[in-house]
Amino acid sequence: MDPRLSRAYGALGGLALGDALGMPTQALSPAQIRSMYGHITGLVDADESQPYAPGMRAGSVTDDTEQALLIASLLVRGRGSSSGHAHLDASEFAHTLLAWEDSMIQRGSLDLLGPSTKAALERVRAGEDPLQVGGKGTTNGAAMRVTPIGIAVSTANPDIFAEAVWSSCQVTHATRQGFQSAALVAAAVSMGIDAA
């Protein structure tokens, strides 16, 4: 197997595994985690009192992995852009997130969007321009889902890299904190893929 492809699989697999390991502990303090689970050493079911994923089965992934896979899918579809570089259309991403949220609600999931993403997408749903709604996003949403950007776009061309990261942040996390955190995660992934 091509080493870059193997590392890409590893990056996505690592994202999903880390997400599944952390799923039962979302939004819990260290004391709450110890009280509910003791010392976690593997995949466990979420407790019924878990605020975001009550009763979720061990090994289940959250919106972190699901949103990353949405970005990966959009990047694959955008590969034929005129620039020849991986491309993520921010407006299309906003509408894809809305459709994903609707499907999660229909399936009865409580593990939906974080506060910054939710607030921005409510404005999109109300008819606002998707490229103008992310100015208050200071949570971790952009960083948690950016792994596919790091896989698809090398840091070798910083301008193209920054543009790709920005396109994944703009709709929900168009802030310095949102962009910088996503850029750091994507850069670490990109350098790992490039074996830098």
Regions found by a protein language model. Give the residues of each.
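Structured, active/binding-site neighborhoods that engage oxygen-rich ligands
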Residues: M1-A196
